[in-house]
């Protein structure tokens, strides 16, 4: 029988000092035999996806204490990728994932907490907490802040849906008037919550649900809707049940590694491919799998990407649907239901509610449930009122979207495409693989051949695009932006956005060892591995070199003679200490970022730390 971890600090005369300090936090004698449960919040006023979380930790804590536990809340940092985008701040985004994971470990282990509820939402916060949960392997439940309502505005006598990406594209489009650009900007992000499309934050919250570590509805129920409150209240009650099951009944099925198994990771990846999730999810799933000692690799992702069709199309791949529409159609469970009916899912998985996949689908799939309360939950809709308050409205759709032929979520026979929304490409330019969000690629661009325009920073590429130096047919190559070379693996949202702004979104390709925002669409290929800073071939590409891209065949190739490449490699190594570094880039890199770069692996490993460099 496992012993409560917290007993280390609450039992025995040698812990009198620790108990004295616990008493100063409000604990009493009656509390010293109870499980201590960490409420891991990520409230910050910097991030719209987190601005409403201040009081939600208290909701969870009250339920924990009412159920027989002791709740202790702490906060992590949270970087807003959209605000950090397009300048040096983006260097800090991906490294913050590791910092969040470490800080959760530090707090939970330093204070011997028995379990935790993770209140996350945006891009690197959910992955960082997920890595920590699988690393620590103590009972854990995730409950996120929820998605933002889609923006809406009237242009040319037509009501259109909007999000952050529209504001960025139209803001740089010289054909859009100042008045219209200002109107779009003011309408794009109307409420608290994670940005309204299938961007990284919402993708990861959906995947956490598919992994079984959060409750049904977590990935899609709007931040503003009153129904979301129940997820927080139930998380507080349920974590105490899981904690007691593990420590008092020796039931390790309550642990994250027992829930997020290889089968669960495969289901989550199948969901990701089916819904055309952010390419960043590949990084984060690979990183989380390593923390949980799950043998889940790029080879698995490649295999699954060839089997799973595209069943759910959401912004930025279309402006017709946002997360509020996914929820109306049944959310994550609705998509999983269609995958299960096609015989594609692993059924031997469970979630934090203790339900296996079939039980979950029977109860929560809108296409088969008889539970009216579930149908009511999935009818939760937007109010269209600007607010930063959670649970501030209770509007409902007049009906659910159960149209699996032409609706937001499709059945297998009416898939948006037979190929899924993500693909792994291999070739001499990316021998360890690279990722493309096929859900956002125009059908006419699935194969592409063109000359390279090479840039060694995102900033130089942006200047070239806006300065008219990139033309139709070009393959824009941005290198030395990987985990090590950046450092920090910046998102290339501005280059892809500005290609659209200048009318080149469908006539150019972009390849990088950096990564892309979940808001990216178009022929944008990222995570090229090995990266330039690790001696990858992308570091040898020169202007005018021809690059072949074939998404249906999963190939990417630099069409340059091997003898020429060998000569270029010799020249590069001849640079000595400066080899495999940018030739002309001025960038201030802090000590913190240099420390991250010194241990960073390439994207095919999840950009996690290279443990071989740490010894032991």
Curated annotation (Swiss-Prot):
Q: Keywords of this protein's UniProt record, alphabetized?
A: 2Fe-2S, Amino-acid biosynthesis, Branched-chain amino acid biosynthesis, Iron, Iron-sulfur, Lyase, Magnesium, Metal-binding
**GO BP: any one term:** isoleucine biosynthetic process
Residues holding [2Fe-2S] cluster: 122, 195
Where Mg(2+) is bound, by residue?
81, 123-124, 491
Q: In which pathway is this protein known to take part? A: Amino-acid biosynthesis; L-isoleucine biosynthesis; L-isoleucine from 2-oxobutanoate: step 3/4; Amino-acid biosynthesis; L-valine biosynthesis; L-valine from pyruvate: step 3/4
Cofactor binding remark = Binds 1 [2Fe-2S] cluster per subunit. This cluster acts as a Lewis acid cofactor.
Q: EC number(s) of the enzyme?
A: 4.2.1.9
The family database entries (PROSITE patterns) matched by this protein are listed as: ILVD_EDD_1, ILVD_EDD_2
Cofactor(s) of this protein = [2Fe-2S] cluster; Mg(2+)
In its UniProt record, a GO molecular function of this protein is: dihydroxy-acid dehydratase activity
Q: Name one GO cellular component term.
A: cytosol
Name of this chain's protein: Dihydroxy-acid dehydratase
Native organism: Photorhabdus laumondii subsp. laumondii (strain DSM 15139 / CIP 105565 / TT01)
Q: What is the taxonomic lineage of the source species?
A: Bacteria, Pseudomonadati, Pseudomonadota, Gammaproteobacteria, Enterobacterales
């Amino acid at each position: 029988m496992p012993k409560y971890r917290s007993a280390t600090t609450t039992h025995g005369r040698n812990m009198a000092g620790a108990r004295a300090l616990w008493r100063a936090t409000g604990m009493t004698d009656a509390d010293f035999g109870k499980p201590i449960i960490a409420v891991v919040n990520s409230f910050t006023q910097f991030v719209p996806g987190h601005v409403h979380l201040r009081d939600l930790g208290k909701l969870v804590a009250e339920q924990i204490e009412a159920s027989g536990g002791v709740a202790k809340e702490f906060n992590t940092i949270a970087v807003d990728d959209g605000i950090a985008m397009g300048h040096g701040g983006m260097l800090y985004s991906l490294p913050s994932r590791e910092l969040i994971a470490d800080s959760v470990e530090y707090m939970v282990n330093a204070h011997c907490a028995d379990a935790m509820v993770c209140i996350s939402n945006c891009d690197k916060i959910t992955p960082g907490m997920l890595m920590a949960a699988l690393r620590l392997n103590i009972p854990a439940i995730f409950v996120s802040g929820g998605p933002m309502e889609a923006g809406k505005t009237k242009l040319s006598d037509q009501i259109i849906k909007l999000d952050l990406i529209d504001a960025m594209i139209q803001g740089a489009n010289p054909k859009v008037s100042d008045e219209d650009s200002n109107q779009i900007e003011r309408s794009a992000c109307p409420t608290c919550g994670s940005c309204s499309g299938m961007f990284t934050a919402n993708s990861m919250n959906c995947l956490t649900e598919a992994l079984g570590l959060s409750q049904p509805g977590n990935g899609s129920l709007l931040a503003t809707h009153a129904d979301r409150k129940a997820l927080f209240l139930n998380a507080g009650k349920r974590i105490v049940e899981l904690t007691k099951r593990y420590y008092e009944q020796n039931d390790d099925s309550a642990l994250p590694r027992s829930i997020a198994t290889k089968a669960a990771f495969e289901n989550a990846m199948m969901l990701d491919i089916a819904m055309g999730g952010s390419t960043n999810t590949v990084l984060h799933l690979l990183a989380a799998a390593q923390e949980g000692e799950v043998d889940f690799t790029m080879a698995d992702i490649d295999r699954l990407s060839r089997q799973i069709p595209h069943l759910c199309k959401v912004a930025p791949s279309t402006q017709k649907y946002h997360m509020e529409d996914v929820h109306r159609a049944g959310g994550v469970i609705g998509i999983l239901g269609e995958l299960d009916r096609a015989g594609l899912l692993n059924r031997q998985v469970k979630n934090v509610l203790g339900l296996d996949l079939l039980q979950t689908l029977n109860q929560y799939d809108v296409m088969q449930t008889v539970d009216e309360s579930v149908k009511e939950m999935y009818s939760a809709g937007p109010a269209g009122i600007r607010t930063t308050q959670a649970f501030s409205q209770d509007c409902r759709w007049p009906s659910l979207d159960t149209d699996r032929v032409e609706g937001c979520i499709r059945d297998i026979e009416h898939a948006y495409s037979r190929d899924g929304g993500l693909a792994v490409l291999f070739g001499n330019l990316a021998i360890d693989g690279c990722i493309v969000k096929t859900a956002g690629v125009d059908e006419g661009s699935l194969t592409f051949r063109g000359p390279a325009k090479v840039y060694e920073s995102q900033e130089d590429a942006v200047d070239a695009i806006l300065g008219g130096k990139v033309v139709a047919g070009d393959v824009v190559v941005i290198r030395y932006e990987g985990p090590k070379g950046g450092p920090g693996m910046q998102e290339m949202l501005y280059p892809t956005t500005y290609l659209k702004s200048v009318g080149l979104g469908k006539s150019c390709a972009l390849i990088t060892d950096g990564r892309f925002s979940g808001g990216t669409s178009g022929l944008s290929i990222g995570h090229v591995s090995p990266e330039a800073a690790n001696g990858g071939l992308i570091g040898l590409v020169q202007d005018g070199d021809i690059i072949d891209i074939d998404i249906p065949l999963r190939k990417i190739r630099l069409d340059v003679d091997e003898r020429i490449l060998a000569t270029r490699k010799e020249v590069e190594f001849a640079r000595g200490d400066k080899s495999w570094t940018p030739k002309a880039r001025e960038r201030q890199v802090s000590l913190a970022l240099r420390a991250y770069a010194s241990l960073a692996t390439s994207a095919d490993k999840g950009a996690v730390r290279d443990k071989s460099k740490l010894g032991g």
